[in-house]
């Protein structure tokens, strides 16, 4: 996702941090090339500082150093790497290069502007639930992120076992808003394991992330799909400590897991709760897919799509061609973005002083 233009002060901060990291890396000697074998392809399944866990084609995982020339490497990156020669290198391998990404998930970062956190994702599973509450506003936020990334979204409503007939009818009406504009919706229960087979099929052949507000059961759902009988947070430490003994670093590091039925998932707290703060208003507008046919049809080129005279989108809402709740959420998102961006600017200014 693209970012807002940084102020000169922010640009200086980003540049200074990058230069500092380059100097730190330059102070450390590169490993001897003779200690490593032939170059091969792999996937970065997690990263810890200047090391990455790289999975080879045979499924084996290798803790690798990262060349200083590599500016950015995140979970999901396809890489070129070399294994350590047995009895020679003190590390299992070294990452030489990163292949071009098909997509990259980012989040705002106070020091570096925008920070990549996962790469090559092709599906965002947007998880919601009737508890703590069904929030269409949050669903719409994640849909905007998906559309901006050009990554296919999948809407999953969890905890459906808690619905009575009346509640199920209400929820189905709400979900019809999204089905009507072309989104796929699945109703599941991780507790009762209902609807999981259909969800498993939707994950095959995909690199997915699971996103949604706290309390909707993302971790429980992932554990059920991965075949784990673990607590909500233990997914973030399983396998990493088994592979490298570095489980203490995994609570914030994104990691790629394989579903037993096929498909992959990249998971971490940062991945689950990425935001929209670094988007432009025009990107938010285009992120509402049903608005697109009306863009360019407004009377004024700088139309805010609110109370402006001759607004084609507003007229479509009045005619029932665009759902009114989506239109309201669109403006809520714009307002909240403005508030967050203003707060961020104040933080930068205060820090500068």
From Swiss-Prot:
EC numbers, comma separated: 3.6.1.-
Keyword Transit peptide found: no
Superkingdom in the source lineage: Bacteria
Cofactor note text: Binds 1 zinc ion per subunit.
Enzyme class (EC, first level): hydrolase
A cellular-component GO term for this protein: cytoplasm
Biased composition range(s): Basic and acidic residues: 16-31
GO biological process, one term: ribosomal small subunit biogenesis
Main location, first listed in the record: cytoplasm
Localization (cell): Cytoplasm
Annotated keywords: Cytoplasm, GTP-binding, Hydrolase, Metal-binding, Nucleotide-binding, Ribosome biogenesis, RNA-binding, rRNA-binding, Zinc
Region ranges (Disordered): 1-36
Cell inner membrane is among the record's keywords: no
Biased composition regions of type Polar residues, renumbered to the chain: 1-14
Binding site for Zn(2+): 298, 303, 305, 311
Domain CP-type G: 102-274
Residue numbers binding GTP: 158-161, 212-220
MF terms (GO), sorted A to Z: GTP binding; GTPase activity; metal ion binding; rRNA binding
Cofactor annotation: Zn(2+)
Biological role: One of several proteins that assist in the late maturation steps of the functional core of the 30S ribosomal subunit. Helps release RbfA from mature subunits. May play a role in the assembly of ribosomal proteins into the subunit. Circularly permuted GTPase that catalyzes slow GTP hydrolysis, GTPase activity is stimulated by the 30S ribosomal subunit.
Assembly: Monomer. Associates with 30S ribosomal subunit, binds 16S rRNA.
Family recorded in the similarity comment: Belongs to the TRAFAC class YlqF/YawG GTPase family. RsgA subfamily.
Name of the featured protein: Small ribosomal subunit biogenesis GTPase RsgA
Species: Erwinia tasmaniensis (strain DSM 17950 / CFBP 7177 / CIP 109463 / NCPPB 4357 / Et1/99)
């Amino acid at each position: 996702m693209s970012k807002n233009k940084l102020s000169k002060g922010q640009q200086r901060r980003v540049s200074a941090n990058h230069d500092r990291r380059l100097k730190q890396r330059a102070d450390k000697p590169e490993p001897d090339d003779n200690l490593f074998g032939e170059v091969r392809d792999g996937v970065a399944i997690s990263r810890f500082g200047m090391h990455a866990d790289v999975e080879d084609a045979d499924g084996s995982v290798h803790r690798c150093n990262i060349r200083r020339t590599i500016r950015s490497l995140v979970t999901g990156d396809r890489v070129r790497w070399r294994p350590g020669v047995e009895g020679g290198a003190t590390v299992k391998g070294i990452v030489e290069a990163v292949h071009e990404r098909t997509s990259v998930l980012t989040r705002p970062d106070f020091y570096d502007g925008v920070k990549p956190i996962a790469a090559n994702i092709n599906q965002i599973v947007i998880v919601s639930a009737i508890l703590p509450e069904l929030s269409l506003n949050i669903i719409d936020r994640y849909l905007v992120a998906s559309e901006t990334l050009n990554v296919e979204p999948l809407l999953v409503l969890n905890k459906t076992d808690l619905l009575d007939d009346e509640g199920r009818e209400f929820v189905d009406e709400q979900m019809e808003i999204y089905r009507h504009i072309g989104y796929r919706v699945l109703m599941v229960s991780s507790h009762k394991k209902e609807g999981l087979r259909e969800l498993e099929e939707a994950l095959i052949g995909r690199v997915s992330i699971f996103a949604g507000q706290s309390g909707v059961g993302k971790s429980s759902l992932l554990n059920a799909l991965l075949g784990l009988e673990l607590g909500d947070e233990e997914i973030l430490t399983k396998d990493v400590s088994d592979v490298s003994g570095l489980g203490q670093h995994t609570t914030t590091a994104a990691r790629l897991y394989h579903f037993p039925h096929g498909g992959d998932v990249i998971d971490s707290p940062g991945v689950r709760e990425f935001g929209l703060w670094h988007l432009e208003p025009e990107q938010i507008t285009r992120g509402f897919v049903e608005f697109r046919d009306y863009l360019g049809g407004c009377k004024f080129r700088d139309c805010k799509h609110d109370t402006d005279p001759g607004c084609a989108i507003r007229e479509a809402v009045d005619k029932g061609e665009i759902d009114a709740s989506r239109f309201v959420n669109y403006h809520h998102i714009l307002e909240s973005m403005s508030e967050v961006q203003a707060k961020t600017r104040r933080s930068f200014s205060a820090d500068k002083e």
